[in-house]
Amino acid sequence: MTNAVEDSGPRDLLFLLISTSRFNRYMPYYTMMAAESLSIEFILYKAGLCFVHCLLLCGAGNTWNDLVDRDIDARVARTKMRPLASGKVTLTEALLWMTGQYFLSVKMLDLILDGRNIWSLMLPLTASIMLYPYLKRPIFSKVFVYPQYILGLAIGYPAITGWASITGSEEPLGDIIKHCIPICLLVFFWCVYFNTAYSHQDSVDDRKMNINSAYVIAGQRIRLFLAFLSVLPLLTIPYIISTINSPWLWVSWMATWTVSIIMQIAQFDSQKLESGGRIHWDNFLLGLWTIAACMVEVGLQKVEFWKNVEGYIKL
């Protein structure tokens, strides 16, 4: 381990630390920009701040995950070359990197919320991020508690941050959380679906080490199980869109997601473990598409497009 670190220059070390944060890869936290709080005047400013906050916090969480799982990762074919698992980054370096990302994310949240409710939002999210890697231990499978549950909560929770950044001075935190429950549920179900598919890539090595993951529920019927999980976010989307009254979102969001998820399940092959990774990638693209669709909706709302269409129809 020592030799690997000594041979790395500062530039190589920086790249290795970045890879522990997954900044060099796609991340589901990017999709948190696709919340209904985007439909206000200063959306771009607030969305940009939320993006940076989520990026930093997700990076810290990924580094923490690699710290806790470094011994497991070293025995899994797909993850054995990760910087911590391979010994290219030391524990001290990773801890410093993680701490820096975390406190920068707190600073960004302070800026987003103007100093309001920072730790009320940050502490539950921090606790879930810290707990996540430990739920992979086999003891939790006995009570049917899987890491995907916590991951779904952690990825859905920042939707509350987005809404609080806009209405926090006018709404109590309890009302903000209540308002965000539908979008949080959507992201929770969605994350459980695509992460179960993603983790199935490692099922062969995971079974050897008795690693806990949601795909163990399905056994040999993983495709049927994924089909069931994929229906849950699709059932949640109509409730969200119906409150916005946007034909555009019915087409760009609901219809697009339905077609995409049907294709994902149709193309999934349990005998080809890499097909789980394909589902994860497809859903990253789906998240980016949803961000774009919501941004278009913001523009349509600003010019009162749907009101004008409704008035034209009445004529």
From Swiss-Prot:
The chain crosses the membrane at residues 40-60, 84-103, 118-135, 143-163, 174-194, 224-244, 248-268, 279-299. One of its GO terms (molecular function) is prenyltransferase activity. It catalyses: 5,7-dihydroxy-4-methylphthalide + (2E,6E)-farnesyl diphosphate = 4-farnesyl-3,5-dihydroxy-6-methylphthalide + diphosphate. It is found in: Golgi apparatus membrane. GO terms for biological process: mycophenolic acid biosynthetic process; terpenoid biosynthetic process. Pathway: Secondary metabolite biosynthesis; terpenoid biosynthesis. CDD domains: PT_UbiA_COQ2. GO terms for cellular component: Golgi apparatus; Golgi membrane; plasma membrane. It is a multi-pass membrane protein. Pfam families: UbiA. Its EC number is 2.5.1.-. It is an enzyme of class 2 (transferase). Keywords: Golgi apparatus, Magnesium, Membrane, Transferase, Transmembrane, Transmembrane helix. Its cofactor is Mg(2+). Belongs to the UbiA prenyltransferase family. Polyprenyl transferase; part of the gene cluster that mediates the biosynthesis of mycophenolic acid (MPA), the first isolated antibiotic natural product in the world obtained from a culture of Penicillium brevicompactum in 1893. MpaA is a Golgi apparatus-associated enzyme that catalyzes the prenylation of 5,7-dihydroxy-4,6-dimethylphthalide (DHMP) to yield farnesyl-DHMP (FDHMP). The first step of the pathway is the synthesis of 5-methylorsellinic acid (5MOA) by the cytosolic polyketide synthase mpaC. This is Polyprenyl transferase mpaA. The lineage of its organism: Eukaryota, Fungi, Dikarya, Ascomycota, Pezizomycotina.
